[in-house]
Amino acid sequence: MAKGPVATSSDDELPFETEEPVADERSFFGGRPQKPAARNLRPALTASLAAPEHYHGHRERLRDRFRELGDTALADYEILELLLFRLIPRRDTKPIAKALIERFGSLAGVFGAPAALLTEVKGVGENVALDLKLIATVAHRTLKSEIRSKQVLSSWSSVIQYCHAAMAHETREQFRILFLDKRNVLIADEVQGRGTVDHTPVYPREVVKRALELSATAIILVHNHPSGDPTPSRADIDMTKVIIEAAKALDITVHDHIIIGKDGHVSLKGLKLI
C-alpha cells in the first residue's frame, strides 16, 4: 500500500496544534534564555498604594481616644502601641506592643529592659530598641530633676520614684549612692558598683572616700534586688552597719539604705534595722 507524503515541520512550526507555550529547547543547551514579555505592573502598584492598610483606621481611632479622653482611656499596651506608631510607621504595631508587655510584664518593665533584650521581641529592631531606651532616659532625667536642688528628705516620694525608675528593672545588682550637702540637697547621684544577679561588692572605705571628695555631709545608700523581692538579706544589714560606722568617724551621716524591688521598696531605717 502506497504511503502518502509525511508532513514535516520546520524549526518554527509544530506538526500539531497546542494551546500551551512550548519552551525553546535551545535555551537549555548554552543558548541565552529568552526573556518573558514585560508585564505592566503599574496598575497593580497603583492599586496597592491606593488601598490603605487595615491598621490605619485603627491608628486614627486610637489617637482620637487619647486626644479626647486622655491616657486613662487606654490600656498599657495601647499607650505603647501609640508610641510605636511613630517608631515603626509601616507595620501593625499592636502585636508588637502586646508582645513587649507580655515579655517584660509592664510599661515600666519595657522601658527598663536592656536594649539587647528588647531586640529579642519580634518586630523590635536595634533602632527601635535605642529609641525606647532614649525615652526611658528622658523619663529618668525628668524624675531626677524633681529632686535636684531640693531638700531630699522633704521630697522622699520623689526620691523613691526616681530610684525605682532607675533601678527596679536592672538585671544585675547595682549599688547607688545619693550624696547630700549640709542642707540635705543632692550633690551627686553615682553608681558605685554593679555585680551579679544577687550580689554587689561594696567597699565602705571607698564610699566614705567619695563622700569626702564631694564634700558631702550625708548619704543615702540604694541598691536593687533583681529577683524583685526587696526584703533585706543579713548581708545587706551587716554591710550597712559597717558603712555607718566608717562614715560616723568622719561626721558623715547615713540617712537610710533603700532596697528597690520590681514592685516596691524597703527602707532599712523604716524597718528599724539601722
Curated annotation (Swiss-Prot):
Residues 152-274 form the MPN domain. A motif (JAMM motif) lies at residues 223-236. The keyword Hydrolase applies. InterPro entries: MPN (IPR037518), RadC_JAB (IPR025657), RuvA_2-like (IPR010994), UPF0758 (IPR001405), UPF0758_CS (IPR020891). Residues 10-22 have a biased composition (Acidic residues). Gene3D superfamilies: 5' to 3' exonuclease, C-terminal subdomain, Cytidine Deaminase, domain 2. It comes from the Bacteria. Zn(2+) binds at residues 223, 225, 236. GO terms for biological process: proteolysis. CDD domains: MPN_DUF2466 (cd08071). GO terms for molecular function: metal ion binding; metallopeptidase activity. Keywords: Hydrolase, Metal-binding, Metalloprotease, Protease, Zinc. Residues 1-37 are annotated as: Disordered. The keyword Disulfide bond does not apply. Belongs to the UPF0758 family. This is UPF0758 protein RHE_CH01848. It comes from Rhizobium etli (strain ATCC 51251 / DSM 11541 / JCM 21823 / NBRC 15573 / CFN 42).
